[in-house]
Design a protein with these regions (language model features):
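A detector for short metal-coordination/catalytic motifs
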Residues: 77-158
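Short, mixed-charge, low-aromatic patches
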Residues: 35-41, 55, 72-73, 155-158
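Alpha-helix initiation/capping motif
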Residues: 16-20, 54-56, 67, 75, ...
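Short, charged low-complexity linear motifs
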Residues: 2-3, 83
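Histidine-centered nuclease catalytic patch
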Residues: 50-81, 90-102
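Short, charged surface segments at domain edges that flank catalytic/cofactor-binding sites
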Residues: 3-50, 113-122
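Residue-level detector of alpha-helix boundaries and kinks
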Residues: 33-36, 68, 83, 87
Length: 158
């Protein structure tokens, strides 16, 4: 199988310049080159590194894992290929929080999600069902928890 790199060098250079400009405005360390962006895109295997969806012939974005506003560096090691949906949903969230959201929403543990879990010491767990369709025992009139369930709050890294 012969693979042909169809990434436009001019567009990559423009994208790198835009990322570098944004990083400069945030006083973030690091400077990216078009070659580093190309390498990150090719390393992703054509999938969103957050949710795992295919990005072949689809729109994609490069996302800082730890956002520049949170002190993240403008380096290739802090970049992932992301679908527009994941990039928008992540926004300025801490990567550990977003990785947990991805895992809860999709059930997937991409290599990036697992790397973030490992980095921040997160043990993924499945939450027990709270709705009657998933837990018919909660529907029973003699259930002592009936009407007493409250939302759970979590502490996330700042």
């Amino acid at each position: 199988v012969i693979y042909q790199d169809l990434l436009d060098a001019g567009l990559l250079a423009s994208y790198a310049a835009a990322l570098n400009s944004r990083a400069g405005g945030a006083h973030a360390p690091g400077r990216l080159t078009a070659e580093e962006l190309r390498d990150r895109i090719l390393e992703s295997g054509g999938r969103c590194e957050w949710c795992g969806c295919s990005l072949v012939n689809a729109a994609f974005e490069l996302d800082h894992i730890l956002s520049l506003s949170r002190g993240g560096a403008n380096k290739a090691s802090n970049l992932v290929l992301s679908c527009p949906d994941c990039n928008r949903k992540k926004g300025q969230k801490h990567p550990a929080r977003f990785a947990a959201e991805i895992h809860l929403r999709t059930g997937r543990k991409t290599a990036l999600v697992m790397r973030v879990f490992e980095r921040y010491g997160i043990q993924p767990a499945r939450q027990n069902a709270l709705f009657a369709a998933e837990a018919p025992e909660l529907e029973k009139p003699n259930n002592p928890l009936s009407g007493q369930l409250e939302p759970t709050s979590y502490s996330w890294p700042e």
